[in-house]
């Protein structure tokens, strides 16, 4: 049984969702307000207006809220207990409107078995993972770098780990910045790409403080690969401070390299995102890079991250696509015919509301969000989980290996 998918269990009560407005289901799908009946087996039983339902049905009046395919967060860290930065899936999953979580390299080949047993298998959300190229993954993130030299990579064990976990592992993850690789530069990206080719899976590369250069990374990647932190504002790694880099990123995106937001504590800039989008360069996917050092400040959750992109003029429909169909394609998750009778229910019910919320990017720049994505329910099979945005707690000054920071 894969995570987020039920084995043979007793039937639950049916669910009737009324007055929902479909969005993000692809060309040709109806966008008219409708009702959806989900059977006790978790599969869609009927779609239409004024549906009849059994007496024991759980009835949810969405009051005109949107319904989309279940949201996918392509970049989180949820190996809780196995790394020093990971959070629990429950902190960023269904209760935040997200039905599929993709862990971005928290586990390496040496500890993926624990991640599978203690996190993936018990989770009600669907969980997939990019396997870290470094054997230890993010056990002590940035304190014990996972890619210092070639001794940190074991090709044979990576191949073996993938063979044993191919239903869970969707690609390889490489963090390519000097905090991790030091003077090793772009070499880990080259090694990772070679292994990804052998496994026939995509690679996700974290770009940040050079070396490696963002430019070098893009030149190595190919169609289907992912560059995360695409709109970071770091010196030497911002696509808006170097016209050649912007043009390269634009060309690579056109060729099928996936630009992923990966907000995180240090990797999203309002200014960079606004300038890039104004020039027509949109991110392929919107993800959070949620972990213990970024959740309370500045990220919060996927809905708020989506709202940030909306605030810098990314169109509503593109924002929805960037958390549904687009990231789903990276992990080979079929998004076709999601509203057809007989399909397993996997939805997010949400509103888009007027607001006046102060939000911060990773550089400390502030923007006021005038429109907010507000998740209401995550529907996973025959379970409708009430959802809401994360409400941050009061921040505190925390000492860590590099000094102090607000969290």
UniProtKB/Swiss-Prot annotation:
The keyword tRNA processing does not apply. The lineage of its organism: Bacteria, Pseudomonadati, Pseudomonadota, Alphaproteobacteria, Hyphomicrobiales. Esterase that catalyzes the deacetylation of acetyl-(R)-mandelate (in vitro). Can also hydrolyze acetyl glycolate, but with lower efficiency. Has very low N-acetyl-D-amino acid deacetylase activity with N-acetyl-D-serine and N-acetyl-D-threonine (in vitro). Theoretical substrate docking studies suggest that other N-acetylated amino acids may optimally occupy the active site and may in fact be the physiological substrates. Pfam families: Amidohydro_1 (PF01979). The modification N6-carboxylysine is found at residue 173. SUPFAM superfamilies: Composite domain of metallo-dependent hydrolases (SSF51338), Metallo-dependent hydrolases (SSF51556). Its cofactor is Zn(2+). Zn(2+) 1 binds at residues 75, 77, 173, 289. Keywords: Hydrolase, Metal-binding, Zinc. Its EC number is 3.1.1.-. Zn(2+) 2 binds at residues 173, 206, 229. This is Deacetylase Atu3266. Disulfide bonds: none annotated. It is an enzyme of class 3 (hydrolase). The record marks 175 as: Transition state stabilizer. It comes from Agrobacterium fabrum (strain C58 / ATCC 33970) (Agrobacterium tumefaciens (strain C58)). Homohexamer, dimer of trimers. The keyword ATP-binding does not apply. Belongs to the metallo-dependent hydrolases superfamily. Atu3266/EF_0837 deacetylase family.
């Amino acid at each position: 049984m894969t995570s987020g998918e039920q084995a043979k269990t007793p039937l639950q009560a049916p669910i009737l969702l009324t007055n929902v407005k479909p969005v993000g289901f692809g060309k040709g799908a109806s966008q008219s307000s409708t009702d959806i009946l989900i059977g006790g087996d978790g599969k869609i039983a009927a779609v239409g207006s004024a549906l009849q339902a059994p007496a024991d049905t759980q009835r949810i009046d969405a009051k005109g809220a949107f319904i989309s395919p279940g949201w996918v967060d392509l970049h989180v860290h949820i190996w809780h207990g196995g790394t020093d930065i990971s959070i629990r899936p429950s902190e960023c999953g269904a209760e935040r409107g997200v039905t599929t979580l993709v862990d971005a390299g928290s586990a390496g080949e040496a500890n993926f078995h624990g991640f599978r047993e203690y996190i993936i298998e018990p989770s009600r959300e669907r969980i997939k993972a990019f396997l870290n190229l470094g054997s230890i993954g993010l056990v002590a993130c940035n304190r014990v770098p996972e890619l210092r030299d070639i001794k940190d990579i074991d090709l044979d064990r990576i191949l073996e780990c993938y063979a044993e976990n191919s239903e869970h592992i969707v690609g390889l993850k490489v963090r390519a910045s000097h905090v991790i690789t030091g003077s090793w530069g772009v070499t880990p990206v080259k090694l990772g790409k070679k292994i990804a080719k052998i496994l026939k899976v995509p690679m996700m590369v974290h770009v940040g403080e050079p070396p490696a250069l963002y430019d070098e990374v893009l030149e190595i990647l190919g169609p289907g690969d992912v560059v995360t932190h695409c709109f970071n504002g770091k010196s030497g790694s911002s696509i808006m401070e170097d016209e050649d880099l912007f043009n390269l990123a634009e060309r690579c995106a056109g060729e099928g390299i996936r630009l992923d937001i990966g907000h995180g504590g240090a990797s999203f800039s309002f200014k960079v995102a606004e300038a890039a989008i104004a020039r027509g360069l949109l991110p392929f996917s919107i993800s959070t890079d949620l972990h213990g050092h970024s959740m309370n400040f500045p990220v919060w959750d996927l809905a708020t991250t989506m709202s940030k992109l909306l605030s810098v003029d990314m169109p509503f429909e593109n924002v929805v696509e960037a958390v549904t169909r687009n990231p789903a394609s990276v992990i080979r998750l079929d998004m076709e015919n999601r509203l057809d009778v007989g399909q397993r229910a996997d939805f997010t019910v949400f509103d888009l509301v007027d607001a006046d919320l102060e939000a911060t990017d990773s550089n400390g720049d502030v923007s006021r969000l005038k429109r907010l994505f507000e998740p209401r329910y995550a529907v996973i099979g025959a379970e409708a989980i009430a959802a809401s945005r994360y409400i941050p707690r009061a921040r505190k000054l925390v000492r860590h290996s590099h000094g102090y920071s607000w969290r």
